[in-house]
């Protein structure tokens, strides 16, 4: 175990509730050990998938609850930096969107495909992945540490709308088609109403503050963890499968024998 996970394990065994940074652990075995320790101690284990507390995602979740989601699209790009060069882009960046689409899709993953690579020696630093869910929803995710600008966006393509969340600007836009196509004249000009865009008002909140406040509420028994050990372990498992697929190029869509 890394130092972080060893400290988390020690706290759980000492009877202390734990909020641990994502990913939950370096591998599935260590994740299972942390989950078991929390259960044995009767203590909370919450995992810091902080984008769950981004106000843009929270509003996106509310909006799509009343929509028929068809495709989810996540883009998480960063320019090259000296930090986090010892970890792959999947575990550093993409795992955020893996967690979010698992929550939004609300169904097991039954198949996936992934491709990517590295610009130099070291971990993978650009990846694209496609996920197929049991309910017919599909997700397309891209993550890169080689971009020329920082991007943090998640879109939900729904039957009657396109919902776009920007996690950096913390805004949400809903593109809708007009229910009726109609024409109107003004002088000699002809107008046609094809659709419109809604700018959703979002209450500004700091995700880290909201996450810590939520953890305190969980400790006091007023809420359940937004991301518990099992949910975080599921995201880690899928991230591991994506990494393995990238290391084995030229493979087509892989079906999972056991839906994830």
For each of these PLM feature ranges, what is it?
Residues 134, 214-260:
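C-terminal helix-rich "cap/oligomerization" subdomain common to oxidoreductases
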